Amino acid sequence: DLVRQLRALQPEIAFVALHGPGGEDGTAQELLEILGIPYTGSGVLACQRCMDKVLAKHLFVEAGIPTPEFFAFSQLAFRELGAADALGEIEERLGFPIVIKPSSQGSALGIKFAGSPEDVPGALVSAFAYDTKVLIERHVAGRDLAVGIIERDGEPHVLPIVEAIPLDEPFFDFEARYEIGRTRFVCPADLGNKVAERCAQVALAAYRLLGCRDFARVDLLLAPEGEPTVLEINAIPGLTDTSLLPQAAAAAGIGFDELVATILDNAHQRQDSARR
């Protein structure tokens, strides 16, 4: 099993590139800490905060970081309240359209757009299939932006911003994210200096608030009036050829090998500091 393999290998550094529950929710990180193995990326608490969208949203609100209006239901609370009352609460608090998401999933899994009350039951079924808690969020019409952040010598730096333009859907869902031809990506996004600086400012504030380190991706929606709102933070963003963080790094002149080396260097520096 994994523990036996890790104990046998005793790696100098574990490069964490896992996704979903068990990988980016702090579980793997906690295991590595128990085994005394240094690792890349955010620590246990930051991963837990990022993975739990509802918790992250509450933290954003408390810190004054702009984020779309929302509330959440656990599966138990939804059953106790009843479908009719739950729908009434949604309509009264948020109106329509809304976006319904599992609280703790990545890659846009289980996310559904609900343009009217009739869309809500199916969207809730989809979200509850992935988690026992769902986030219900006011839909913000605007541009989907991904702000990659990478640290060098302990300081986070914002990479060129990526804009995701879905070609046939109202928002950037799982299919639009992963099916070739469903989304066009533009990097750097055509934002203008003032808006780009504001997006970077908001993304860095969210990154620091949740305690991220080494690298992350902050997903924003840019409203028509030019104000960015934070949707979520991915503590372990994808590192494939088509992933957004490597695209952003490439636009900054950072090749994939250099990107990986930089992430590893951060972990090495932490290890060296801990030994002193």
Can you name each region flagged by the protein language model?
Residues 112-201, 222-229:
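Phosphate-binding site of ATP-dependent enzymes
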Residues 30-39, 116-121, 252-253:
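A glycine- and small-aliphatic-rich helix-loop capping segment at beta-alpha/alpha-beta transitions
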